[in-house]
Amino acid sequence: MESMGLTAVGFVNEAAIDAAVRRVEDLFSPQVVQIQYTLENNHYGDPAITFRILVTDDAAHDIDQLYELSEKISKTLTNEAHTYEIGLDAHFSYRTVSEQKKLPDPMWK
């Protein structure tokens, strides 16, 4: 039986979320460089997960292409991590590699 970790948002199987994130990274490689997440409560105090998706500059070159990619990634992450089934409100933040170089943020490593 896998252990369930108690987090600020309750009982969440972080190993299952980690595995889902790695699957989505692999699925969308090479456009996706890295996906990270944070478990927290949203501004209403409800359990939430915020995904930070780092994409290549090429993936973001065309706004329509980026929109389509972000929609696919968001839906796939939600489905793979079963966020709604486990009671987590999913949020998504996207950044390009060049943006990260200009605006270094430790949350984005």
Please give the residue ranges for each predicted region:
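N-terminal presequence-like segments and adjacent domain-start helices
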Residues: M1-I17
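Short edge beta-strands and adjacent turn/loop segments
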Residues: P30-V55
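N-terminal leader/presequence segments that precede the conserved core
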Residues: M1-G5, V33, G87-H91
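Short, non-transmembrane amphipathic alpha-helical segments
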Residues: N13-E25, A59-I86
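Short acidic, gly/pro-rich beta-turn/loop elements at beta-sheet edges
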Residues: E25-S29, G45-P47, H61, K102
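Polar/charged, Gly/Pro-rich intrinsically disordered segments
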Residues: E85-K109
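Short, charged/polar micro-motifs that form catalytic or ligand-binding hotspots
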Residues: T7, F11, N41, Y67
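Residues that cap or initiate secondary-structure elements
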Residues: H43, D57-A59, S98
